[in-house]
């Protein structure tokens, strides 16, 4: 299982709520200079005790992604990284928190996903307002996802009103920095999350992928799904568990916010510094799952009553380090060679067994230097499992002794460049590429992608 994606809402409404501008509150009361100047009282004024000073920030550089796209890079004084990429189209405000299920002790497995759910259930900054109602008023979309190593949240829409961008950033910052974690909401969300866990466990693909990760990296866990966790874990969670995990992982220096769309970087950064002003630092050592790659092949056959004469096959390999942009480009080239050309290396295999073979790279650890995983996945009839595996291994082995021809290499490069151009056009795809690259410190993957190809 790659990730769990949750709430998605959309609306055609174009009304944007007007958030009142806050007046700065002096940190120290001034003494009146004369009797005439002294103010005895102020009527019709509601004090706002939540006003905070904007966070100072520095510009750390620029990344030229293409002829038309340049990323402006900043760092807030609290350690949070911010990247802003002006472009036409939808504006996406997205924050990547560098934590996931591999940062959870096994008895808390699933808490990252559970917290992701609960961040939509109200924040101190939002007050009595309902998050989804405010998003709907802007005609915006919102969603989140949890994976092995990262949890991300976004709000996206076209900017139809002058206040839309500020409202989006304010809502987004509030949910990530100051969730209420109300007891009644926490208990209610357990039922929803447990239903999702049961759904995940009913799908052979999730079980197979999880077991591949466990076997490849020697991970011991009582949960059959490493991202979703177990219903026993979720049911037993206390509010203290939630608050402690949140405080120890959701701190500014562990987050990257990326904004792509029709924005002015300077003005946008002022808004970010106004609302992303947390001073939080972790007070405990973070948990990192021990990942020890196996030194010899492991095969495990799992019997499922849901297979109906078919078998799902997962073949896992240790992949490149998260921060190794050059090798990640090579993985993309390998995928293209194997299955994304008109006459790919897997074409005859897929035709012979009437199936398709996918290859995906997954970030497992939140540490930049740790290895990723490469997984081949397919489905075949039960009777074809053994001959298919033999042919699959043979096809993979041939690549080592029969590298791409010049014709294949040219086709691979053209295909990769076309794919690169396509994701540059989409705000969401561009945002994801920027966020994942910045998390792992491989900015060259953004600025030198075509050169590496």
Feature-to-residue mapping (PLM):
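Extended amphipathic alpha-helical segments enriched in small hydrophobics
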Residues: 373-405
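A structural supersecondary motif
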Residues: 139-141, 314-318, 338-380
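Short cationic amphipathic helices and targeting signals
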Residues: 152-156, 251-262, 374-379
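C-terminal structured "cap/appendage" subdomains that terminate the fold
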Residues: 440-453
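His/Glu-rich zincin catalytic helix
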Residues: 39-130, 163, 170, 243-352, ...
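Non-Sec secretion/translocation targeting segments of pathogen effectors
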Residues: 1-49
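Acidic/histidine-enriched segments that form metal/cofactor-coordinating
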Residues: 44-52, 97, 124, 131-245, ...
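Peptidyl-prolyl cis-trans isomerase
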Residues: 85-87, 148, 363
């Amino acid at each position: 299982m790659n990730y769990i994606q949750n709430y998605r809402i959309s609306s055609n409404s174009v009304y944007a709520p007007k958030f009142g501008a806050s007046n700065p509150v002096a940190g120290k009361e001034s003494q009146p200079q004369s009797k005439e100047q002294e103010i005895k009282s102020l009527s019709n004024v509601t004090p706002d005790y939540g006003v905070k000073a904007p966070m100072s920030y520095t510009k750390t550089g620029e990344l030229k992604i293409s002829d038309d796209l340049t990323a402006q890079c900043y760092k807030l004084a609290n350690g949070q990284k911010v990247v802003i990429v002006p472009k036409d189209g939808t504006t996406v405000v997205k924050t990547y928190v560098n934590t996931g299920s591999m940062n959870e002790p096994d008895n808390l497995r699933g808490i990252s996903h559970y917290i992701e759910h609960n961040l939509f259930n109200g924040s101190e900054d939002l007050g009595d307002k309902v998050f989804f109602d405010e998003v709907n008023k802007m005609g915006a979309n919102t969603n989140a996802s949890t994976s092995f190593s990262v949890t991300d949240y976004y709000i996206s829409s076209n900017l139809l009103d002058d206040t839309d961008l500020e409202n989006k950033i304010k809502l987004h910052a509030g949910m990530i920095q100051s969730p209420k974690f109300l007891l009644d909401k926490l208990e209610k969300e357990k039922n929803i999350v447990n239903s999702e866990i049961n759904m995940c466990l009913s799908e052979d693909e999730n079980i197979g992928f999880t077991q591949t990760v466990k076997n490849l990296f020697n991970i011991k866990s009582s949960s059959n799904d490493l991202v979703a966790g177990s219903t026993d874990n979720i049911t037993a969670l206390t509010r203290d568990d939630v608050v402690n995990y949140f405080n120890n992982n959701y701190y500014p220096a562990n987050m990257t916010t990326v904004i792509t769309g029709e924005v002015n970087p300077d003005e946008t950064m002022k808004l970010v510094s106004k609302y992303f002003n947390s001073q939080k630092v972790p007070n405990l050592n973070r948990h990192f799952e021990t990942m020890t790659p196996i030194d010899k092949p492991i095969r495990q056959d799992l019997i499922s009553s849901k297979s109906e004469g078919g078998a799902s096959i997962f073949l896992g390999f240790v992949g490149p380090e998260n921060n190794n942009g050059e090798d990640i480009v090579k993985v993309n080239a390998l995928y293209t060679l194997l299955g994304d050309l008109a006459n790919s290396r897997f074409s005859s295999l897929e035709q012979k067994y009437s199936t398709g073979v996918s290859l995906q790279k997954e970030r497992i650890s939140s540490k930049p230097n740790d290895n990723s995983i490469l997984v081949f996945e397919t489905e075949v009839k039960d009777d074809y499992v053994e001959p298919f595996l033999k042919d699959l291994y043979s096809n993979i082995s041939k690549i080592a002794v029969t590298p791409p021809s010049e014709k294949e290499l040219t086709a691979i490069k053209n295909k990769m460049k076309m794919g690169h151009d396509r994701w540059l056009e989409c705000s969401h795809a561009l945002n994801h590429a920027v966020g994942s690259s910045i998390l792992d410190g491989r900015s060259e993957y953004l600025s030198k992608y075509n050169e590496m190809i």
